[in-house]
Amino acid sequence: MTSKTRKVAVITGANSNLGLNIAYRLIERQSADVRLTLVVTSRTLPRVREVVELIKKFVATQEDPCSVDFDYLLVDFTNMVSVLNAYYDLNQKYESINYFFVNAAQGVYDGIDWIGAVKQVLSDPLEAVTNPTYRKQLVGVKSKDEMGLVFQANVFGPYYLIQKILPQLSKGKATVVWISSIMADPKHLSLQDIEMIKSDVTYEGSKRVVDLLHLATYKQMKSQGIHQYVVQPGIFTSYSFAKYLNFFTTFGMLFLFYLARLLGSKWHNIDGYKAANAPVYVATLINPHFEHQEVKYGSASSRDGMEYIETTDIDKTGSSDVLAYIEKKKLEWDDKLKDQITNSRIPI
């Protein structure tokens, strides 16, 4: 009996709708002779257990699936000691890593401006559910590490971890996938405020930083045998705003999503499974020596819901500034984190 090919995939934010569907699609794309270890990350152990059970149920529905093992990281990307502990765990357990999905999507939301929402929906319903201006975000929120919280959660924390595990990624000829957004417009980021301390659009701004960081680093990553891509999942139902919606507003949101797609919006995937198309596409289907890395790969859907991949160009203005800022901060934290590793492992 021949041994199975072992692969390791790390999925950050695996307990989200998108993260869970990335796991599903990644499993589907593996042949039966693969033994895939899924390393799911979350801030809490109960969420890890919940995700693992859901993935196990999915595997049970598949015909001739690959073998799937489970591991986990308890990591809070807004806590650099926690990030360092995650590195320590990965470094101790894995010689090579084949996939790394950066699905960090933290925001500092403060509800919905309902008057603004009604006005935008009435004046431009398609724009209202593509680039909403009525989501209220807090300004000036910092982490305990004194960084812009959303910047640290969505950009710097994951980047720092990736830099620490470069040997494992290189040995695994890994694909690194950064999840960006269709809302990552250059107007949402000031290069004088890269941590977005003064910004009221920190989520969108953080995804713009992701775009620029990718453009500034993918060639250097490729020189180490690591193929890095940036993708966006389009518009889909997520859990981040559920607490601000009731039954009627949720129904209204879904109605507008389907209406937008009917009117020709290719980005309204609605379903988390379709949203996960682009992340897994770049990780498993493309020829890394042919596909372009300087563009953003997007999950798209036709009017009747047929999924496909659409690429968009990325404005590279500011990419060198972003890299210089983040590299300087990385050196600062290398010094701060000396002798800071602790053990957070608990059996699942």
UniProtKB/Swiss-Prot annotation:
Superkingdom, natural source: Eukaryota
UniProt-recorded Gene Ontology molecular function terms: 3-beta-hydroxysteroid 3-dehydrogenase (NADP+) activity
InterPro entries: Ergosterol_Biosynth_ERG27, NAD(P)-bd_dom_sf, Papain-like_cys_pep_sf, SDR_fam
Any one cellular-component term (Gene Ontology): lipid droplet
Active site feature: 180, 203, 207
Biological process terms in GO annotation: ergosterol biosynthetic process
Pathway it works in: Steroid biosynthesis; zymosterol biosynthesis; zymosterol from lanosterol: step 5/6
Entry EC number(s): 1.1.1.270
Presence of the UniProt keyword DNA repair in the record: no
Paired cysteines (S-S): none
Family statement: Belongs to the short-chain dehydrogenases/reductases (SDR) family. ERG27 subfamily.
Protein name: 3-keto-steroid reductase
Species this chain originates from: Candida glabrata (strain ATCC 2001 / BCRC 20586 / JCM 3761 / NBRC 0622 / NRRL Y-65 / CBS 138)
Gene name tied to this protein: ERG27
